[in-house]
């Protein structure tokens, strides 16, 4: 596994953004994962949509080939370390959970939120929208 998709990247894929779809088609699904927090955010967005049933089906289809990574003990330890390192200029809690999973698993986080995530020590970030 190489890449962990942030929620914003998943949303762009669900909205059929060409640059994201091209990158996803160019890599093996075995190399791409989402954190359980991202999965939760996607499900919440589906429930909030104008067409919850259709949105839930789209989310399920999108997630089907991808590994879902839990917030495990290693991620919890990285979370504490990163939260301490960022205490003077913290990032959002959900973003910190996602970043912690990426760091714990040694994965590159694919996000459009480069400004926020670039401050996270030991986290490699890529943007696939170009």
Provide a role label for each language-model segment.
Residues 1, 99, 103-130:
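Acidic, PIN/NYN-like endoribonuclease modules and their adjacent C-terminal/linker elements
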Residues 1-34, 44-61:
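Short, well-structured N-terminal submotif of metal-dependent ribonuclease cores
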Residues 6, 35, 91-92, 113:
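Histidine- and aromatic-rich ligand-binding microenvironments
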Residues 6-7, 20, 42, 79, ...:
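Generic structural signal for small/hydrophobic residues in well-ordered secondary structure
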Residues 9-10, 75, 97-98, 115-116:
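Alpha-helix capping/helix-boundary segments
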Residues 65-110:
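Active-site neighborhoods of divalent-metal-dependent phosphate/nucleic-acid chemistry enzymes
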């Amino acid at each position: 596994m190489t890449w962990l998709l942030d929620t914003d990247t998943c949303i762009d894929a669900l909205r059929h953004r060409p640059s994201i779809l091209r990158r996803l088609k160019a890599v093996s699904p075995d190399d791409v994962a989402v954190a359980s927090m991202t999965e939760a955010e996607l499900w919440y967005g589906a429930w909030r949509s104008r067409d919850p049933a259709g949105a839930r089906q789209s989310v399920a289809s999108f997630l089907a080939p991808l590994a879902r990574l839990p917030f495990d003990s290693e991620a919890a330890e990285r979370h504490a370390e990163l939260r301490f390192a960022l205490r003077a200029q913290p990032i959002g809690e959900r973003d910190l959970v996602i970043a912690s999973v990426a760091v714990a698993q040694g994965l590159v986080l694919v996000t459009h939120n480069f400004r926020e995530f670039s401050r996270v020590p030991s986290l490699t970030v890529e943007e696939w929208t170009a």
